[in-house]
């Protein structure tokens, strides 16, 4: 979760990712967003349960506080280990860095939809929108998925 969040944040932020004050909070927020998708679906499937329950689809807020803490430590370590902006340049040349994140969004988003967990589904759709915005697929999504023609680049390569 953490590495994918970090990488997605780098791509979505573009040149703004050069600032650690922008990059790090964005990555931490994306980790939290992914857990807001994962945990409700996992609880619905019975993969895990919390004795005290929780107001967010059976998940206590303390779980998310723990994710914020662990994400903060992990993201800072990634930033140091990957030399922050040096990774951004490498990421721009590799089209397939986020393939497993696509699977994550589809799988856990679909499970949330099946259990009528609408808020986690909305977060999954937002993450999916972020993935679409990065345009990191080995096929033209706009040509493959009906209704997404608006994603096609304009003349000159710009997206709408």
Give the location of each predicted region.
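Aromatic-rich, lipid-facing transmembrane alpha helices and their immediate juxtamembrane interface loops
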Residues: 1-160
């Amino acid at each position: 979760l953490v590495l994918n969040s970090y990488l997605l944040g780098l791509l979505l932020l573009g040149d703004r990712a050069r600032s650690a004050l922008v990059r790090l909070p964005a990555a931490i927020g994306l980790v939290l967003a992914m857990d807001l998708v994962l945990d409700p679906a996992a609880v619905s499937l019975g993969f895990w349960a919390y004795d005290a329950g929780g107001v967010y689809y059976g998940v206590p807020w303390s779980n998310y506080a723990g994710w914020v803490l662990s994400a903060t430590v992990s993201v800072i370590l990634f930033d140091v280990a990957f030399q922050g902006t040096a990774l951004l340049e490498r990421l721009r040349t590799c089209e397939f860095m986020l393939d497993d994140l696509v699977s994550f969004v589809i799988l856990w988003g679909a499970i949330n939809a099946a259990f009528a967990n609408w808020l986690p589904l909305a977060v999954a759709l937002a993450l999916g929108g972020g993935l679409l915005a990065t345009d990191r697929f080995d096929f033209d999504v706009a040509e493959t998925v009906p209704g997404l023609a608006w994603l096609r680049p304009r003349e000159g390569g710009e997206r709408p």
